[in-house]
């Protein structure tokens, strides 16, 4: 092979100089700044911005709900089903079984109320007329809500205790996922109290409409539910722990405000494999809404 002269390397040297010049000139900031060598987390930053925006918008929504003058009536249909199991049957619940044990007895109760809520200024009242009990017609005015183990008052204001501007300072929030509720895209927000308290002790997860930031659903954390007592049944083949699932769905909309369509409470025992035994189911369905006032109160 013949020898190469120095002149033959000139084109290669020129090319290398051009590439080095272009590299340093086009990317000077990124590679000359040592902090750019550290890994970035764009997803985390993006999620925090999204969360901050959601909290601002839902705070505005809750202020609207809180300051609304309301007067409406609807039908409130309550079904309470209690399933009684022998303790021995529960403790021998097979981990390999595809179905839970059958109850030895079932008790069913049902009530239909004419429900009325009136809110004017700071005055808030709810009234019930019992129309039916276990299939028998009734007409009892100003009755107390028939005893069920778990129920909430003033459910339309549930979002306020989670996301109003005042209560936001008492919670820590994070985006827990995304979902679809009744065909509407939603962001799931997990709320956790900064400190334990007696007032407004509930916390859990909230489904927020991506479009208008109204509240589509609330799921209460069992540990925040009053009358809930943690219980553990010990078994040689696996322990059973009692849990309570409580969700409120806001399926009716009027003047930009959402009203409850259903409350569903389920008390269950769950084994180590995630298999469930239903002990009690309470469903409250709201229908036939009639609105007389839904307006923002003007404050001077």
Feature map (PLM): residue ranges:
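Bacterial N-terminal signal peptides
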Residues: 18-33
């Amino acid at each position: 092979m013949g020898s190469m002269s120095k002149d033959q390397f000139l084109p290669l040297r020129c090319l290398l100089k051009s590439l080095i010049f272009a590299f340093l000139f086009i990317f000077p900031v990124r590679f000359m700044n040592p902090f750019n060598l550290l890994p970035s987390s764009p997803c985390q930053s993006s999620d925090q911005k999204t969360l901050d925006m959601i909290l601002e918008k839902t705070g505005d929504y809750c202020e609207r709900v809180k300051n609304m003058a309301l007067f409406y009536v609807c039908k409130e249909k309550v079904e309470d089903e209690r399933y009684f199991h022998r303790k021995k049957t529960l403790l021998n619940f097979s981990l390999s079984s595809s179905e839970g044990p059958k109850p030895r007895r079932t008790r069913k109760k049902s009530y239909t109320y004419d429900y009325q809520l009136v809110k004017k200024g700071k005055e808030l009242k709810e009234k019930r007329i019992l129309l039916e009990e276990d299939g028998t017609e009734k007409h009892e005015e100003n009755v107390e809500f028939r005893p069920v183990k778990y129920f909430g008052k003033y459910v339309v204001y549930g979002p306020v205790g989670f996301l109003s501007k005042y209560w936001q300072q008492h919670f820590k929030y994070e985006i827990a996922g995304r979902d679809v509720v009744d065909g509407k895209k939603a962001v799931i927000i997990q709320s956790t109290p900064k400190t334990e308290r007696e007032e407004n002790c509930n916390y859990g997860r909230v489904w927020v409409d991506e479009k208008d930031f109204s509240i589509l659903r609330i799921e209460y954390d069992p540990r925040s539910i009053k009358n809930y007592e943690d219980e553990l049944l010990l078994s040689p083949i696996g322990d059973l722990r009692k849990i309570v699932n409580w969700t409120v769905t806001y399926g009716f909309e009027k003047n930009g405000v959402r009203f409850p369509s259903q409350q569903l409470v389920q008390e269950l025992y769950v084994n180590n494999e995630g298999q469930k035994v239903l002990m009690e189911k309470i469903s409250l369905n709201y229908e036939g809404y009639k609105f007389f006032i839904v307006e923002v109160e003007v404050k001077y």
